[in-house]
From Swiss-Prot:
PROSITE patterns named among the record's database cross-references: RIBOSOMAL_L9
Designated name of the protein: Large ribosomal subunit protein bL9
Keyword Protein biosynthesis part of the UniProt annotation: no
Organism of provenance: Polaromonas naphthalenivorans (strain CJ2)
SUPFAM superfamilies: L9 N-domain-like (SSF55658), Ribosomal protein L9 C-domain (SSF55653)
Amino acid sequence: MQIILLDKVVNLGNLGDVVKVKDGYARNFLIPFGRARRATAAAIKEFEVKRAELEKAAAAKLAEMQVQGEKLGGTTVKLTQKAGVDGRLFGSVTNADIAQEVTKQGFAVSKSQIRLPNGPIKTVGDHAINIALHTDVVVDITVTVYGETA
């Protein structure tokens, strides 16, 4: 299916690109989430009329996320979990736990934006993680996990 991208999509293209994707990807993800439209002649003409407005909105969103990224970058998040004497956690710290704690600190972050390079955190100590605020804005923060013995 040919589609017009209304937003930058990772590994696919930028705003305004006409790309061919599988029908299911377009129908079930890109179009319902407002990231793309079918590439009909009428849709292409309509997009060209709105192109400057969409680019301006995308640039404003990027600038806003860069400002938030500068504030959030280098932040340390402290979590306490039950752990054994050897420093291994009973369970793990997931991206949902981290997103909840970052949100408590005043930053609007969803769990889908948290990137755990080594999977869920299962040990006590400092761990470096990434937060993807925007496709072009990824910040590094430190998660410190303290063990709590029962």
